[in-house]
Amino acid sequence: MAISKKKSRLTYESMLSRTPNDWDITTSALPEQVKALFPHTIDTGIKHGTVTVMCHHVGYEVTTYRIDGEYEDGRHPKQVVFTPSLIEDLKRRDFTINAMAYNDSRGLVDAFEGQQDLQKGVIRAVGEPEKRFSEDALRIMRAVRFAAQLGYTIEEETEAAMRRLSDTLTKISAERIQVELVKLLVSDHPGHMKILYETGITKVIQSEF
């Protein structure tokens, strides 16, 4: 599959010399431009800038750099604005370890010190933690799950925001919460379950236990 130089992608797993479960492919090219570059594409989520490029019967999701608008339902932005800036796109990511990108021309793009947090073993929200969790409350569960999978700690301000906003998990479906709980329980560090108690999360999701 030929990848344009505009496209950048990276996962924390590759930085830890692990085999990534998936790659996020993102680009400054607009969805229409991506579709024009490849003969076989599927309009997966044009509204949010995502096109699936088919190559040898395998689908690759390619998403245009974007800035998210206000989140009204605690999960989806009301609208998105496409941007030519990779940094603006990375600003909307949940945690610093997920806010890195790489391409052959620029190398590693790490505006939020995700590599440093990987080395320190820290889960830290990008920017203002309360804003990140207000956008999607499931990120509160994801913080604990990532900490359990990697054996990391959660940065102080990030954990404090989790505690303050734990009640917002009532907006999240039981199915989505269960997925995160299962991943936590089968992780290498299931003892991190204690974080759910320490942050008050268990009081909100007791029905899932």
Q: Could you tell me what each predicted segment is?
A:
Residues 1-209:
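Catalytic cores of the polymerase beta-like nucleotidyltransferase superfamily
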